[in-house]
Amino acid sequence: MTNTSFSIEQFSLKGKIALITGASYGIGFAISKSYAEAGATIVFNDINQDLVNKGIEAYREVGIEAHGYVCDVTDEDGIQAMVKQIEQEVGVIDILVNNAGIIRRVPMCEMSAADFRKVIDIDLNAPFIVSKAVIPSMIKKGHGKIINICSMMSELGRETVSAYAAAKGGLKMLTRNIASEYGGANIQCNGIGPGYIATPQTAPLRELQEDGSRHPFDQFIIAKTPAARWGNPEDLMGPAVFLASDASNFVNGHILYVDGGILAYIGKQPE
């Protein structure tokens, strides 16, 4: 019989183990913090020991004892070994957030094929590799949540981000295909598509000019966004908890855009 009642406990992550890739700072850190506050055990990885150590210390400063691992998300053998180690030391992963990513802002005809491949490797191939590593144990356990950090750039184009947009467009479709292939195993795979978020990656676009004026791109984004501001990593916390919790058990293959309305807005008519 279907349970027709609602309980706020549906949003609880108590007893869950969450792996968030590249979560020493920024969006990944904010999502991890929200998961910990919802009751989950936090596991994260980063590319080197220094970043992992800094991440562990940052988590401790906010009262979270996180488990940190050094691993390159593009190294398939390394990821397989890391997941096995996590299962032995912490437990089977219930929630995976494919957060690690990079961007290269270069006009397409000036971008090397090597740089293009690097973005694709980290932003698209890595979520495939990490998801592939965790899904078998999720199937055995009878449930699992995978959240891919996509982007509004999977829906529109802009100069200098061809590799990033291509990777995030591919990640959107990987999300839908994981949902299609493993939904019957009670695995939900969804994506969060952030708009322009104030992180270290976007800091150069928000720097004040020498005369004290706003960066032209900063002005452009604020004018183009109905919310009239950049997003913050904390704006992704609620959506991330929803997609990791039982409250989203019938949501699968969906990209939840958290963009302040930018995708819905054609822009203001010039006066």
What are these regions (language model features)?
Residues T2-E9, L156, V241, N252-E271:
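Short C-terminal tail/terminal secondary-structure segment
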Residues I17, S24-G26:
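Conserved glycine-rich cofactor-binding loop
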Residues P107-M108, D115-I120, F217, I221:
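Substrate-binding pocket helix/loop in short-chain dehydrogenase/reductase
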Residues F128, H143, R229-V258, L263:
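C-terminal substrate-recognition "lid" of short-chain dehydrogenase/reductases
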Residues S131, A167, T175:
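Active-site helix of classical SDR
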Residues P136, S180-G184, N249:
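Alpha-helical segment proximal to the catalytic Tyr-Lys
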Residues S151:
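Residue(s) in the substrate-gating loop at a strand-loop-helix junction
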